[in-house]
Amino acid sequence: MKIRPLHDRVIVKRKEVESKSAGGIMLTGSAAGKSTRGEVLAVGRGRSLDNGEIKALDVKVGDTIIFNDGYGVKVEKIDNEEVLIMSESDILAIVEK
C-alpha cells in the first residue's frame, strides 16, 4: 500500500535502537528503550501560509532524523510494518552523514 501524507506531515520508519551498552552488555526490553531516530519514507506538500502559499518541508525522503516521541506522533501499521506519522514540527534534527 502506498501512503501519501498531507500538508506538513511526515511518514517515518523508526530505526532500531542499539541493543548493546557501551560496556558490551546486551540490553533487552525496556532497558534498550525506544529509538527517537528514524528514516523519512514520505513527506507532504508542505505547510499552508496565511498568504495561501505552500512552504515546502525541510526534510526529504531518505533523511535520517531525530524526533520528539511524544504527543502528536501517531503510530500506524502499513503492510504489517509500523510507521510513525508526525508533523514536521515534531522533528528536532536531520542527521547529516
UniProtKB/Swiss-Prot annotation:
One of its GO terms (biological process) is chaperone cofactor-dependent protein refolding. Its main location: cytoplasm. Together with the chaperonin GroEL, plays an essential role in assisting protein folding. The GroEL-GroES system forms a nano-cage that allows encapsulation of the non-native substrate proteins and provides a physical environment optimized to promote and accelerate protein folding. GroES binds to the apical surface of the GroEL ring, thereby capping the opening of the GroEL channel. The lineage of its organism: Bacteria, Pseudomonadati, Pseudomonadota, Gammaproteobacteria, Candidatus Palibaumannia. GO terms for molecular function: ATP binding; metal ion binding; protein folding chaperone; protein-folding chaperone binding; unfolded protein binding. It comes from the Bacteria. The keyword GTP-binding does not apply. GO terms for cellular component: cytoplasm. The gene is groES. Keywords: Chaperone, Cytoplasm. It is found in: Cytoplasm. This is Co-chaperonin GroES. Gene3D superfamilies: GroES chaperonin. InterPro entries: Chaperonin_GroES, Chaperonin_GroES_sf, Chaprnonin_Cpn10_CS, GroES-like_sf. Belongs to the GroES chaperonin family. NCBIfam families: PRK00364.1-1 (NF001526), PRK00364.1-2 (NF001527), PRK00364.2-2 (NF001531). It holds the Pfam family Cpn10. Transmembrane segments: none annotated. It comes from Baumannia cicadellinicola subsp. Homalodisca coagulata. Heptamer of 7 subunits arranged in a ring. Interacts with the chaperonin GroEL.
